[in-house]
Amino acid sequence: VSIPFSPTYLRIDTVRILRNVSNLVFTIGLPVFMYLVFSSGQTGDFQLPGGNGAALVAVNLATYGACTACAAIGALTAWERQQGWTRQVLLTRLSPVGFAVQKLLTALLVAAVPMVVVLGIAASTGAEASWQTWLTAGVTGWLGSSLFALFGLLVALVMRSDSAIGIASGSLVVFAFLGNIFMPLSGWLLDLARFTPMFGVANAASRPVTHGWLDRTTQVPLWQPWATMGAWFLVLGVACALMMRRTGGRA
């Protein structure tokens, strides 16, 4: 009888990934470095409804780090296929759907690390916001980042090679740009960005700080980022399910 969940596999997989130094450099070190660079200007003096500019930079980059971690872990499935690890796991009582659920949970556990580290460093180096704002923004960005675990898994299912990790992680840079994380967008580019997956996650996460304001004249409706995330969860979830059915759950 197949099982949908294995605490032992979840623990082993999470520890294995956290021991990979290169993963930690890109998911934790890079967002921290970018925060220190981007917040070194006048962001601390720029006030927003829920905090200062440094707090917004911190939430955006913590969300980026969490999303990068999730995408890389989802795409790691392609490498595990080549090494035969996925086949070994599926020889146990863990079902293919259960395996996908385990990957999602592993991604969330690992994604919590950059979220906590970046926000913690920010809160102690000039970023100002209430603890309720930090908590709400952090939890929202953390849960929203799971969307990119599905994206990474889909890339792995389509590519079925170790290049999937590079493609998935590299795509996050483009998504982050369109998600209004690296720089404010305007005009037609902003209109396009509203329909991209990272925009929904980043805007929902930063809303406790910005209250939805992108600039002095543009406010994103409360429903829009959640609708965007919901639509992308549906699209990527269905696509992953179809690809898994197409491969017959084979490793």
Feature roles, as predicted:
Residues 1-30, 84, 250:
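Aromatic- and glycine-rich beta-strand/loop motifs that create alpha-glucan
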Residues 3-9, 181-223:
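Short hydrophobic, aromatic-rich alpha-helical segments embedded in or entering the lipid bilayer
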Residues 18-44, 54-72, 112-114, 167-177, ...:
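Hydrophobic alpha-helical transmembrane segments of multi-pass membrane transport/permease proteins
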Residues 33, 53-125:
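Hydrophobic alpha-helical transmembrane segments of multi-pass membrane transport proteins
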Residues 37-42, 158-199:
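Transmembrane helix segments
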Residues 48-77, 140-153, 157, 238-241:
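Hydrophobic alpha-helical transmembrane segments of membrane proteins
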Residues 96-166, 222-230, 234-240:
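Alpha-helical transmembrane segments and their short interhelical loops
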Residues 209-213, 226-251:
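Junction motif at the cytosolic side of a transmembrane helix
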